[in-house]
Amino acid sequence: MNIFYIFLFLLSFVQGLEHTHRRGSLVKRAVCYDTDQVPLNIFFGYNRADKTDSNKNMALNIFNVFRGFLAGEGGESFYNSNGNVYGFMWVGSMVHNRGFKDNILPIMENEVKNYGIPKTLYLEYDGGGDPMKSFGIILDTTSRDTVVKAAKLWSQGKKLNSYEGSKNYQATACYLSYAYRKPIVNDNFVGTCDYFTLESGKTPADQSGINGESLQGYNPNLDFSKLSAGQPICKTIGNPPNFKPSKNSDGSCKTYKVSSGESCSSIAVKYYPLSLNDIENYNKGNYGWKGCSSLQKDYNLCVSDGSAPRPVSNPIAECGPLAPGEKYNAKCPLNACCSEFGFCGLTKDYCDKKSSTTGAPGTDGCFSNCGYGSTSNVKSSTFKKIAYWLDAKDKLAMDPKNIPNGPYDILHYAFVNINSDFSIDDSAFSKSAFLKVTSSKKIPSFGGWDFSTSPSTYTIFRNAVKTDQNRNTFANNLINFMNKYNLDGIDLDWEYPGAPDIPDIPADDSSSGSNYLTFLKLLKGKMPSGKTLSIAIPSSYWYLKNFPISDIQNTVDYMVYMTYDIHGIWEYGKANSYINCHTPRKEIEDAIKMLDKAGVKFNKVFGGVANYGRSYKMVNTNCYNYGCGFQREGGNSRDMTNTPGVLSDSEIIDIDSSDKKNDRWVDTNTDCIFMKYDGNSVVSWPKSRYDLEDMFKNYGFAGTSLWAANYFKHDEWKNDEDDNNDDTEDPFDEENVYFDVYDCKNKAGYDLDNPVYGCRLETAINIIIWNGTESVNTVLNILNDYDNYIKYYEALTRAHYDSVMEKYEKWLFEEDGYYTYYTDVDGDDIIITPPDKKKRDYIQEKYSFEKEFMMSQNMTELTEIKVNKTINFMLNGTSLAVKEYNNEKVLYKRGDIPPPGSNNRLIRNSIILDKDKEAAIASFKQYSGIELSKDSFVQRDKDKKFDLNGKHYTFMHSTILNAIVLFPNVLTNIDSDYIHHISDLIEQAHNSLGNESPDNIYEVLESVVVFMSVSEIADYTYTEGKKIKEKYDKMKKTMIVGIILGIIGGLSLFLGPIGIATSVLADFALLGADAAINGELNPSDLAFALAGLFLPVFASLGKTFKFAEALQKININKSKNFDNLNEFEKIRFFRSKLGKVKMCGS
C-alpha cells in the first residue's frame, strides 16, 4: 500500500516536471507576415520566490500593455510596471514587432497564466552578439534594477545570465531585412547608460564590439565624425553620463587649468556632456577669453556656470586683474592706461581699444583708464619766461645781465651744490654775477642730472627726503640759504625719484616719490610768503610715474616740464633706437596730453624749450636721416659744450655758416631741423622755439623755461669772481649783436613807431618772416593741386588776355584809322575802307575775306584776285561783287564769316615788323596805359579767334600779343628744392633773431620778399582763375593789365603800416614780379629797393636819423643824386639795376 502511494506520487511528480519545463508542444505554429522566419532555441530563466495571485494579475496586465506596444511598427525597448511588478521587453531593430507579439510574447504570457510569477522570470536571445537581432522579456517582482540591468545587457547583444532555474524553448522569430529595419531610438528609462571612454587610435565599434549603427542610436547627440580620445560613449540605451561640474559654493565657476596641447574639445570630453558652446558661454566674462580657437596654456577655464575666476597673475604685471598680490586690480599712476596684459602706459599699445571676437574683458585692448589726454584751447592770460643760467667757465661763460632773447621773468641759477649732510655749498654762488641781476626774479636751482645720477652724489636727494629728521634739516638749510641771499624762491631738480634704471647707480626705492611729496609739503610750509617753490619734472612717463604729481601740483607754485632730451645717444642698443630729434613735436604734444590725463593744471607748468641740438655719429655716412642707425659715442663736439652728442645753438650756427656743413633739411616726422656735418655726424634741433612757445601759450601753460641761456651766441665773458664787482654797464649800442626784439614790443604787438633803428628793422624782419612763412604754405598748397592750378591759370590768362587784346584791336584797327570793313545791309558786298597810310607806316596789312554762306552753297574754289580786278561769285544765278582798292592783294578762302544779315565779323591779317616794334610799344602805351615789350608781340602761323566786346575777331597769320610773355606762370621754375631753400632762409632769420645784427638778418630775407610776390601772384591766379573758370561764360568784365599787379594786396599788407604811396607800391610790385618771372634777381639791388621803400618811414619816425644815415646803415647809397629823385624815379632807378643772378641770391 505504501509502495503504491509512493509510486503514484513519483509518477505525478515526473509528469509535473514535464508540464513545467517542456513547452515546445504548447507553442503555436509561427506566423511571420512575409518576414524571415528563423527557428531559434530561446533561453528561459527564473529565480524562485513565493508566487501570489496579485503578482500574477499585475504581470498579465503588463503583458497587455506590451501587446499594445508591439502593435506599432517601431520601437526596440519597452518598459512598464504595475504595482510591485516591473517589466521590460527588448525587441531588436531587425526583429519584427507583430511576429514577436504573436510568436514570442505568448511564451512568457502562458508561463505566467499557468504557473504564476516567481521573483524573476525572463526569456532572451542574444542575436549572436548583435543587439539589432537580439530580444528578451523580463518580469521582476522585487526591484526595477533587475529589469534595467537586463535592458542594458540586451541592448549590447549580451545575455542576462542570472537565474536559479532555466530551460529552453524552440520557437520561431520573425526578422526584418536590413533594408526595412526599425530605426534605433535611445530609451532613457534605464537612467545613465553603460559607457566606455574612447581610446586614441580606435573606433567606437572596434573598442566596444557593438556595431556603429547601434552606438549612434544610443548617442544621438554625438557627432561620430568629430570624436576625440577620452570621449565617453554609451554602449547601451540610457542617458549619457554627466560629468559637468556645478559652480562653487561662492557662486564662482568651476575652473580647469589648461595644459600644453589641450583644446576645448579635449577638455569638454572630460566633462561630458560639456559642449564647445557651453565653454564659450561660460567664459564670456572670463578675463582674457579669446575663444576656443586661441586657448592659452595655464588659462583658468570655466567649465561650469558662475562668476569668472581671478585670472592667473603675471608676476611682472602692474595693473588690472593680471597684477599679482596686492597689485590686483590696481590703477596705473598718472591715470595712465592699463593694457589688456596688465601694464601701464600712454601709447596706443596701452590706450586703444580694439575689436574682439569674444567681447570678454582683457581681449579688446585697453582694460582701464583708456584713451588719451587732451590739450587745452584756453590761452594763457599771463605768460612768463624762465631761463636757466649756467655758472660756467670758458666759452660757456656768459654775463647773466646780458642774456639774448630776453627779457626773462625768472632766472634759475644752475646749479647750487648740496653736501652729504644736507647743508648747502655756497662757495661759488656767493661770488656769482648772478646775484647782481636785477631785471628778473632770481631763483637758485638745486640738483640737476649730474648731481642726481653721479655715483658720488646720487644718495643725497634720496636720503634727504627719507626720514622726518633729514627732511627737516634739509628744508631748514634751503630756507636759510634763500634768505641769506635774498632770493625769490627755491627750485629743485631731482632726476628722478624712484628711477629704477639709471646707469652706474642702484635703482631707487619706489617710496622715494611719496617721500619727495612729504618733503615738498614741509618745505613749502616753512617758506615765507611771496617766495616760490618749483620743481623740474620729466616728460617721460617712465620717470614721471614715480611722482605723485597730482598732489605735488597742489603743493608747489610751478613745475618746469622738461620737454627736451626725449631722444639721444643714451638710447644706443635699445629697441627702436635710431637717429632722431630730441624735441619731436608730436611726442611733446603727447607728453602734454599725459599731464592732462594725470589731472595736472597747465597753468602751473612751464613748457621746456631748448636752444641746443642732440648729435649722432652715423653708422653709415650715406644714411644720416631720421631713422638711420648711430654709434655709441655721439656726434662730433665743438669747444663750447665740448661734449660728444650735444651742440649749443651757437655751435650749430657756426657749423651752419661754415664749410663743415654737408647738408641741412627740415624733417617732417619731428618738425625739427637736421644738419649733417663733418662728413660723419648729424645734429637736430627744434625747427622753431617760437612755434613751441606759441603752442605752450595756446595750451594755457604758465610760460616757457629755456635750457640754457649760455648756449646762445654771446660775447666772450670771463666768469671771474674778482672781476664781478664792477656794476658799470656799457652804454646802449644800437648795432649791438644783442639787440633785443622784446624791447621793441608794446602790449599791442609790434611797435613801428619806436625810434630805435633796430626796432623798426626788427619789426620789418618779423613781418617778412610771418608773411614769408604764409607764402611758403600758400605755394605748397597750390603745388599740391597743380593740375587745377594750371586750369585756373589758363582761364585767368584768357580773361586778362582778352581784355588786353580788346585794347590792342581798337588801337590797331579802329581808333587809329586802319582798314575797317563790314558786310552791307544785304550781306552781298564786302566793303573795304582804306586807312590813312600816314598814321602807321610801320604796319603792313593784308586782308582776306569770306562769306560763310558761300560755303553753304558749295563754293569751294580758292581764287586769288589781282589789282583792280572785280570777280563775280554766282549765287543762285546772282552775281556777288567783291571790290578791291589801293592795289592791295585780296585772298578768298574758306573762313568763319556768318550768313547775310550778320554785321560783326572782322578778319585781320596785320604784321608789325621788328623795326617798328618800339614805336608800336610807345603808341600802344600812350593809347592804353599798358606797357609792352618786344617779346610781347608774336606772329601766329594759325588763325586765332577772339570774342571781344560783342564782336568776333579772327587774326590770320597776324602779329598779336603773346599771352605767355604778358602773363607768365610764376610757378614754372618753382620746385620743392627752391621752396626748401626759402624755408631755410626764413628759419635762419628766425633763429638769428637776437643773435645777429638786424642788418645781416635783413639781407638774408631779400629773396624771401621776392618769393612773397610770387606767392601773391600764384594765390591770385589760383583764387581768381578758379572763379573765372567756374563762371567763364558769364564773365564779360574788362580787366586791368597784368596779373602782376595782384601782388599789391600782399605788399600792402607787408608795408601798409609804413604808409608808402600806392603808385610806388605798384611799381615795386612790377619790379619784384619781373624778377620772380625770370627767376633772377640781383640781391643787392633788391636790398636797395627795399631800403628805398623804408626811407620815408625812417625819415618820419627817427629824429636821430637822416636819409643819408639810413642809407649808410644798410649800404645802399649807390647814386649821388638819389635823394633828388622822387619816389617813382627811385623805383625806376632800382628797376634799372636788376641783374641776372639767381633769385635766391646763392
Swiss-Prot record:
Matching SMART domains, A to Z? ChtBD1, Glyco_18, LysM
Q: What's its catalytic activity?
A: Random endo-hydrolysis of N-acetyl-beta-D-glucosaminide (1->4)-beta-linkages in chitin and chitodextrins
**Among the record's GO biological process terms, what is one?**
chitin catabolic process
Query: What is the originating organism of this protein?
Result: Kluyveromyces lactis (strain ATCC 8585 / CBS 2359 / DSM 70799 / NBRC 1267 / NRRL Y-1140 / WM37) (Yeast)
Q: Which family does it belong to?
A: Belongs to the glycosyl hydrolase 18 family.
Q: Which Pfam families match?
A: Chitin_bind_1, Glyco_hydro_18, LysM
- Repeat found in the keyword field: yes
Q: Where is the LysM domain?
A: 205-234, 254-303
Enumerate the InterPro entries for this protein: Chitin-bd_1 (IPR001002), Chitin-binding_1_CS (IPR018371), Chitinase_II/V-like_cat (IPR011583), Chitinase_insertion_sf (IPR029070), Endochitinase-like_sf (IPR036861), Glyco_hydro18_cat (IPR001223), Glyco_hydro_18_chit_AS (IPR001579), Glycoside_hydrolase_SF (IPR017853)
Molecular function (GO) terms listed?
Answer: chitin binding; endochitinase activity; toxin activity
Q: How is it modified after translation?
A: RF2 is potentially split by membrane-bound basic amino acid-specific peptidase to yield the alpha and beta subunits.
Q: Which residues are glycosylated?
A: 771, 858, 868, 876, 1117
Instruction: Please report the stretch or stretches of sequence annotated as the GH18 domain.
Output: 383-735
Positions annotated to bind chitin: 424, 447-450, 496, 562-565, 707
For this UniProt entry, which segments traverse the membrane? Answer: none
Enzyme type, top EC level: hydrolase
Q: Which domain of life is it from?
A: Eukaryota
Which UniProt key words apply to this protein? Carbohydrate metabolism, Chitin degradation, Chitin-binding, Cleavage on pair of basic residues, Disulfide bond, Glycoprotein, Glycosidase, Hydrolase, Plasmid, Polysaccharide degradation, Repeat, Signal, Toxin
- Can you say what this protein is called? Killer toxin subunits alpha/beta
What does it do? The alpha subunit is a potent exochitinase. Along with the beta subunit it plays a role in the initial interaction of the toxin with sensitive cells and allow the gamma subunit (the active toxin) to gain entry into the cell.
Disulfides per UniProt: 319-338, 332-344, 337-351, 366-370
- Give start and end of each Chitin-binding type-1 domain: 316-372
Share what the entry says about its subunit structure, partners included: The killer toxin is composed of three subunits: alpha, beta and gamma.
- Residues annotated as coiled-coil are none
